[in-house]
Amino acid sequence: MPMFVDPKPPSQYLYFNFHPLRNASMSQELELKLLIAPEKRDQALKVCQSLADARSGTTQKTQFELRNSYFDTSDLRLRQFDMGLRIRSHKDQKEQTIKLAGRVMGGMHQRPEYNVNVDSEKPDLTLFDSEIWPDDFPVYDIQRDLETIFVTDFTRTRWRLPSGDGVIEMVLDEGQIQAGENSETISEIELELQGGSIDDAYHLAHQLVSKVEAKVGSLSKAARGYMLAGKSLLEPFTQMHYVPLEGDFTIGQALYRAVEYGLRHWQHNESCLLFNPSVRAVQGLADGIQLVRVALEQLIELGVGERQLLTNLAKITEQLQWLKNFEGLDELTAEDGAYHRALKRYEKLYESLQNSQEDVIRLNEVAEVVASARYQTTVLKLSQFLIEQEMTEELSQPVSPWCSQLLKSDWQLVQTAFSEHEKLNEEGYLKLLKPLQNSLLMGTCFGELFDDDVREKFRLPWQDLARGIREITALHILHERIKERDDDDLDRLLEWQKMQRESLLKALEYSRKAALKRDPYWFA
């Protein structure tokens, strides 16, 4: 069976708004998606009605049934073009919709869509304007091979709230996604801006988080449907790539892009954590948070953004500290690691390390953190921050000269710290790990603006150095585990791990001196 593994978060591809059926060509969707627990359905209805009444005093809810059939080819060619195709049925009306590539930022979904009323149960791509397709899009081949992938059936309760120069349409959807014999519950609230105020939409979202424990939703019904049908995999992102920047970007464009990139990485891994909990997903989530933090710090220094967001990110990160112990133990027990073969000879010690690794995992605690009001509020605030993208005169300046100076100033501090001592001990290296990692993340933000070869030649020894410093933690853990033992191997093990620590320090010293000789890439 063909399987599509998204190269970027699936939530960027397919998400559907809830406008009434209409004759129209193109619209730009802008909606906030929030998930609620099915058992909170009655409470959610009451809260939504209360919010609607408070805004207009006379808002009436309407309720109707919707059925959506989603189409693609067996080899998922629409999905590969970042497109989603459906036919929506409501009573005797049918509407055919194609969704093109868009973006998702903290639950806010933006995506162009094209709609046309139809009579058939099967979509006809030739009814859309031919100008919407990419140059290499094989319309007729795809049309010939279309088939139903999955369907959604749900009850929609809708309120239209006056806001700004338009309305915010608030809906509660309850029903099922069906793919063959597999089904999954739909229970979500969406807030669509139809000329309404962004501030109003986010204010409503914060109230729903507070009153019904709503969660920001980055996966659409369609993304979930593809997974349910076995057509798409949700895999954690384990590697942070350079933020995709262009040389003509302004400072603001580059920094907002970095925050958005980090948030997408974070939320994709959060979705992986909730659907299939794993340490890899938590690691990816933590990496995304750190990239957001680094870029956000620069924006705040330049006068935009709330410092409270940084405080919230720090508190979330504090609750992921167990990852350090897990990664240290993983360094010792991984089959492709440097210590596996030697430690495997000491069966009881090796089993103890493996058991300890399992014991430090806190996936349930991370799920509780993700569900917390603080976490959800932080994501919503970041989402609004990215949608609004406040600009100043300074943020409107070209990014290249600014980031070159930033990287230079930041690296001078790191370089001084690493070169002020002729020789560093373990504690000295551990103290320098955080500023080194921070500077490497700064390079992740802006590295795309520089020559690939020169950049990698400079970064590689520093990345090796960071990995080696983290390895010190692993050997500290090993030292403590060995001391807890009481058998004939104790002295031999202590001597062996002492040799490993001495060997590691020699390697770190070599890497440090090699790294300090490299010429910075930002002035190449």
Regions found by a protein language model. Give the residues of each.
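N-terminal amphipathic/basic-hydrophobic helices that include classical n-h-c signal peptides
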Residues: M1-A24
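Function-determining surface determinants
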Residues: N23-A524
